[in-house]
Amino acid sequence: MGREFDQLFDQWALTYDDTVYGTDEQYKEVFSNYEEILDEVAKLSLGSVLEFGVGTGNLTKRLLNREHKVIGIEPSKEMRKIAKQKLPHLQIMEGDFLAYPKISEPIETIVSTYAFHHLTDEEKQTAIKRYANMLSTGNKIVFADTMFVSDQAKQEMIDQAKINQFHRLAEDLQTEYYTTLPILEEFFQLENFTVHFTKKNPFVWILEAVKK
């Protein structure tokens, strides 16, 4: 994963929480049911958790409240700063989905919300292979992110964003690496996971992959 988005996230850090809680009209549907989505990801998690893309710590707080041990990985310096202000005892390290410090302790769940789309499909597959090697039978990967049932469905959402004059959203959908459910399902099945998808809003699905 390139670090081309780091500057964007440093700039976004101070207003990120406002965006996810619905103050940005263009992203209102993307972040609809936000708290419910975070709650469900936390509920699906088991044991020791490795979280990629901690952001400002909104999911992390829920995981800690459920008494999970959490190791957080976050590329943005400003996001890490805000997360540490919210959660002073959080173990959070600089890194991303593909480049992160060595994790020496056993991990039972790997989680991420609104972030896996920063990887190309090739990078996604590489990441999933690595994570599969970290997990034992019954362990999980739980991701919530924008994804689509097909390329056609993705194009329809881009077209609708343009009709609504949501130009930032349309550009985002065209320039980030949002993928499809069949592609993700194949990547996980190749690494011996069973996969289940749950739709949470017009954009976001929760992916739960359990290691066989």
Where are the language model's segments positioned?
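Class I SAM-dependent methyltransferase SAM/SAH-binding core
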Residues: F52, T56-A99
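Short amphipathic alpha-helix with an adjacent loop that forms part of the alpha/beta core around
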Residues: A99-E105
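A short glycine-rich, Lys/Arg-flanked "PGG" loop and its adjoining helix->strand segment in the class I
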Residues: Q125-T137
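Core SAM-dependent methyltransferase catalytic element
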Residues: E191-K212
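A conserved beta-strand element that flanks and buttresses the S-adenosyl-L-methionine
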Residues: V111
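Conserved class I S-adenosyl-L-methionine
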Residues: M1-L44
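Short catalytic micro-motifs in class I SAM-dependent methyltransferases
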Residues: Y114-A115
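C-terminal alpha-helical "lid/dimerization" subdomain adjacent to the S-adenosyl-L-methionine
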Residues: A144-E191, H196-T198
